[in-house]
A protein has these predicted regions:
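Non-catalytic membrane-proximal stalk/linker segments that position and tether the catalytic domains
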Residues: 1-43, 154-155, 159-181, 187, ...
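Short beta-strand-to-loop acidic/aromatic patch adjacent to the donor-nucleotide binding site
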Residues: 63-74
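Conserved donor NDP-sugar-binding/catalytic core segment of glycosyltransferases
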Residues: 78-105
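A short, conserved alpha-helix in the catalytic core of glycosyltransferases
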Residues: 127, 137-154, 158-159
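Active-site proximal beta-strand in glycosyltransferases
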Residues: 269-286, 303-305, 325
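Short beta-strand->alpha-helix junction loop in the catalytic core
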Residues: 284, 310-311, 327-337
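A short, active-site helix/loop in glycosyltransferases that binds the activated sugar's phosphate group
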Residues: 288, 300-324
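Conserved small/polar residues in nucleotide/adenosyl-binding loops
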Residues: 347-351
Length: 351
């Protein structure tokens, strides 16, 4: 057995700062299979902890927090340090970002405004006592996690990928069991027009009662905007063509596919039971390279909208029969404002 960090974890580790948390006594409660976890815990910088498979006998008065682990996983050497530090700030429920897949190529970034029922979370002693009382003495780790998620009063998200699940990410990792689910598909998360405009959809969907998850290739600038707006973000380099992650869409109540580049995903969902909004921003130039992936006809579940007449005409150049509505994003009309004239000659040197 060995531990290997994902590319994201290695990148983050180089920037992490050590915090002395050795006075905080923690339990790691993992009643199920925990071979990989046990190996990873050997390398923890925070040493004042104990791995247990039975909770009640180990809950002494000195225990300040318990890491609830419902399945085998690996963690970075700094994981318990970060969890202990979060407890010191007054948090009663602490979660973190995570890597998924054998090589950790899928990354999950959580938002404090959207916390699904986690498979692993740190719970303060005070919250744990309340949760165990509500669980009526049953120390089922999944039940404790479910109740802790619902009863937490001061939830804290650590913006570090401290955990690594060797399996692939699934819908239960990003959505709660009984919430309305919205999945946003974006072929890029850069600071360019389409992704930036897309962030405006997140608060709108949240106001309609949706839990929002964004799927994109990598953090290229706009990822923090989606997190701040209240969405969880899943990144994978081949997200546009990875059918396993499209499986998230089949468990969603609504899918927003951003730009024509998501044609392959729309084609897969075409005619299914999942409502799809295909939002077009694209000009003519890209269509010769993507036209062969665009469905010939669209099922009743797919609705196409564009940001204006140019984007509409671009799609009609290859699919003239598509019905396309207008969904215009609102931006300030700076052309109507009065700006003082700028004369570059004023700044030329006398020399």
């Amino acid at each position: 057995m060995y531990s290997s960090y994902s590319t994201l974890q290695r990148k983050q580790l180089t920037k992490q700062v050590y915090t002395d948390t050795q006075s905080t006594y923690l339990l790691v409660y993992a009643p199920g299979r925990h071979q990989a976890l046990e190996h990873a815990l050997e390398n923890q910088l925070h040493r004042k902890f104990r791995l247990v498979t039975e909770l009640a006998p180990a809950l002494t008065d000195s225990v300040e927090g318990v890491l609830l682990v419902s399945e085998d996983l690996e963690c970075t050497s700094t994981a318990l340090t970060y969890f202990a530090a979060a407890l010191r700030t007054g948090a009663d429920f602490v979660v973190c970002d995570a890597a998924f897949g054998f090589d950790g190529s899928t990354a999950l970034y959580l938002s404090t405004q959207h916390i699904p029922c986690s498979r692993c979370a740190m719970v303060s002693r005070k919250l744990l006592d309340r949760v165990r009382a509500a669980a009526r003495g049953r120390d089922s780790v999944t039940e404790l996690l479910r109740l802790a998620t619902a009863m937490a009063e001061n939830c804290h998200r650590i913006p570090q990928s401290l955990l690594h699940f060797r399996r692939e990410l699934c819908a239960d990792d990003v959505f709660s069991a009984d919430g309305k689910r919205a999945l946003i598909l974006s072929h890029e998360l850069t600071m360019t027009g389409a992704p930036i405009v897309l962030t405006s959809a997140v608060p709108v969907l949240r106001s309609m009662g949706f839990e929002v998850v964004v799927l994109g290739p990598a953090d290229d600038g706009s990822l923090p905007l989606f997190l701040d707006a209240g969405a969880a973000v899943v990144t994978r380099s081949d997200c546009v063509m990875n059918s396993s992650l499209w499986g998230l869409a089949t468990s969603a109540d609504f899918v927003l596919a951003n730009t024509v580049v998501e044609a392959a995903a729309v084609s897969t969902l075409n005619g299914s039971f999942v409502p799809v909004l295909w939002w077009l921003h694209d000009a003519f130039a890209g269509y010769p390279f993507i036209a062969h992936k665009i469905p010939k006809t669209l099922g009743s579940n797919v609705h196409v909208c564009a940001v204006g007449s140019h984007a509409t005409a671009a799609m009609h150049s290859v699919r003239p029969d598509f019905s396309i509505e207008q969904l215009i994003y609102g931006l300030p009309d700076y052309a109507q404002e009065s700006f003082p004239p700028y004369d570059c000659l004023l700044y030329t040197s006398d020399a």
